[in-house]
A protein has these predicted regions:
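Glycine-rich phosphate-binding loop signature in dinucleotide/nucleotide-binding domains
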Residues: 43-45, 93-97
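Domain-level recognition of soluble alpha/beta enzyme cores
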Residues: 118-146
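Active-site-proximal alpha-helix that buttresses catalytic centers in soluble enzyme cores
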Residues: 2-82, 120-121, 130-131
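Short, solvent-exposed aromatic-acidic interface loops
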Residues: 147-155
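Hydrophobic packing residues within well-ordered alpha-helices of enzyme cores
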Residues: 60-64, 87, 111-112
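Generic beta-sheet signal
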Residues: 3-4, 95-106
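Short active-site segment of divalent metal-dependent hydrolases/proteases
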Residues: 11, 107-108
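Short alpha-helix plus adjacent loop in nuclease-associated cores
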Residues: 79-91
């Protein structure tokens, strides 16, 4: 099956945000990216949508959830500063059934570096701009065997 790793879309400026960073929303551009992800991932096969509980991650996947009639499940293992082991365990848990997981720019490179150094076939150079997707393809046992990159949708 397949696990889709999505980095949250463009958020408002961190320096200009005085409130709790967990509450920082997407920017206007980020909202457009989130809606464009619906078409980009229209043929993707997954039955769960998991997200960091941070507002910007939840907002990134809400349009996909609405289009598919699926709930968005907030998961701390995808939050900023989450331990790599927790995220790896989450990917492994959902590798057979398929899932979309929205996360942050600190966790995504750690996951990708782990898979690259573990011998997973990386079909593209490692990068993780906001709104991008990495598609993790698994074998019948749920082991990640290939990863490919989908650039962020252009608005």
């Amino acid at each position: 099956m397949t696990v889709y790793l999505v980095r949250h879309a463009k958020a408002g400026d961190r320096d200009g945000w005085a409130d709790d960073d967990r509450l920082r929303p997407l920017s206007g551009r980020g909202h457009r990216q989130a809606y464009l992800l619906v078409d980009l991932l229209a043929d993707a096969k997954f039955d769960r949508i998991l997200s960091s509980p941070y507002v910007r991650c939840m907002q990134t996947v809400v349009p996909i959830a609405g289009a598919r009639g699926l709930p968005v499940e907030p998961v701390e293992a995808l939050a900023e500063d989450a331990p790599l082991g927790d995220a790896l365990e989450l990917v492994q848990k959902h590798a057979i059934s398929g899932a979309l997981m929205c996360m942050h720019g600190d966790l995504m490179p750690m996951l990708l570096d782990h898979y690259a150094s573990s011998g997973v076939e990386m079909r593209h150079e490692l990068r993780w701009p906001k709104g991008c997707t990495w598609v993790l393809e698994t074998d019948a046992t749920g082991e990640v065997v290939r990863a490919r990159y989908l650039p962020p949708p252009v608005d």
